[in-house]
Swiss-Prot record:
Family under the similarity heading: Belongs to the bacterial ribosomal protein bL19 family.
NCBIfam families assigned: rplS_bact
Keyword annotations of the record: Ribonucleoprotein, Ribosomal protein
Gene3D superfamilies assigned to the protein according to its UniProt record, in alphabetical order: 2.30.30.790
Organism whose genome encodes this protein: Dictyoglomus thermophilum (strain ATCC 35947 / DSM 3960 / H-6-12)
GO biological process: translation
Molecular function terms, GO-annotated: structural constituent of ribosome
Protein's name according to its UniProt entry: Large ribosomal subunit protein bL19
Name of encoding gene: rplS
Cellular component GO terms, alphabetical: cytosolic large ribosomal subunit
Amino acid sequence: MDLIIQNLEKEYMKKDIPEIWPGDTVRVHYRIVEGDKERIQVYEGVVIAKKHGGIRETITVRKVVQGVGVERIFPLHSPLVEKIEVVRRGRVRRAKLYYLRERKGKAAKIAEREENEG
């Protein structure tokens, strides 16, 4: 039974998703439908969490707008997600970066990861 579900989910999974890790700064192009109009909104921020796996995989992206922290959860394999770009690689030692919620300014900055680092 589990194999049947995996095969069914596999055909709906996207193949063009880049490798994303917590601490990375990403730009998510998200399709928004308002009435009969459709537009693409670009949301740029730091990945603070990556959850689940397979077709249910989600990322939580955080950004600060006019001094207020805004977080949004994106399902990676959703047809509404047009494209995801990795702007910057961050170097962190945690899988969940929820501690960034309490930090402000320079304390919330994440060091950039060099290409040869794991």
